[in-house]
Design a protein with these regions (language model features):
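Histidine-centered active-site microenvironments of extracellular/periplasmic hydrolases
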Residues: 5-14, 92-98, 131-179
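Active-site loop->helix "elbow" adjoining a glycine-rich segment at hydrolase catalytic centers
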Residues: 2, 118, 150
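A long, amphipathic alpha-helix that forms part
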Residues: 65-73, 101-141
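Short linear motifs at secondary-structure transitions and domain/linker junctions
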Residues: 36-39, 57-58, 119-122, 152-158
Length: 179
């Protein structure tokens, strides 16, 4: 959400390695979104890697974590800072079928199943990250912070534990996040 202004890009804000989607998010369909890669998708997304577009394979969250893990493995012998802001869960609500299937008997509607599937996919990837930190003997010397940027955009009845409001709201359901 920092736009496409060069001075706000991560490579101009202290990051040595940058692997991001373009302005507006992946898969969003509103005027002005995806100006750099029209019709980009959550599956096999085109990503900007250090200023160059690369076509990737897989679901976007998996792709971001795979690249982060590759980079971390190369840095493991020296201190590093890695920031992995996932695109999901974010509209449009799309998830791999195997993750949506986990919720078919628990909630109605494809979008709800995909929303929860996106979250489960993040959980899987965070678990993989923790496993790799253990494998590389980094877990005991690593601070892992897991947070979010806002409350749910999906509605407060089942997604915000009864808190009033959601994404974009000043109420607790829109602004209460860890840390």
């Amino acid at each position: 959400h920092l736009g496409e202004q060069d001075e706000y890009q991560p490579n101009n804000r202290g990051f040595d390695e940058v692997f991001i989607h373009g302005c507006g998010g992946i898969g969003q369909r509103f005027a002005g979104s995806q100006g750099d890669v029209p019709k980009n998708s959550y599956f096999d997304p085109t990503i900007r890697h250090n200023g160059k577009f690369v076509k990737t394979k897989g679901f976007c969250t998996d792709v971001f974590f795979q690249e982060a893990l590759r980079w971390m493995k190369n840095q493991k012998d020296k201190p590093f800072f890695a920031y992995i802001p996932t695109n999901a869960p974010h509209g449009p609500f799309i998830a791999p079928d195997s993750y949506k299937a986990l919720y078919k008997d628990h909630t109605k509607g494809d979008a709800n199943q995909a929303f929860f599937g996106m979250i489960s996919n993040i959980d899987t990837n965070v678990g993989l990250l923790m496993k790799k930190l253990e494998e590389w003997d980094l877990a005991d010397n690593t601070l892992l912070i897991y947070s979010t940027d806002n409350g749910s955009a999906k509605g407060s009845k089942i997604f915000n534990a009864g808190m009033k409001g959601g994404k974009g709201s000043l109420n607790e359901g829109g602004s209460r996040v860890p840390l």
